[in-house]
Amino acid sequence: MPLHALSGDPFDALGDPNRRAIVELLRTGDRSVSELAEELPISRPAVSRHLRLLKRAGLVADRAEGTRRLYRLDDEGIAAVREYLEDVWGEAPTRFRLLAENTSERTGRDAR
């Protein structure tokens, strides 16, 4: 799934330290809102709000288990972010080389 296919902006969603902490906690497995709230310095309603935003951004999915909901990382959304970053990072050495060449050309001209 390409990054633009996600309904929300995953980078905006990851801009908040509490949401990043939730993502880190979910890396270890499925958790309920209560389990997440026990690990974080925020209330259960705040955790729920953050999870809604992460879900809208395609980074988190949920499922019902009995009377509670369990949250997990959404593999497709995480893969889309990873693919995007790999594409951007893969171009970085070429861009750096071009920048270095342009800088040295300008420096050489300025020295004359």
Please provide the spans of the model-predicted regions:
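Alpha-helical residues within the helix-turn-helix
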Residues: 24, 38, 49, 55-56
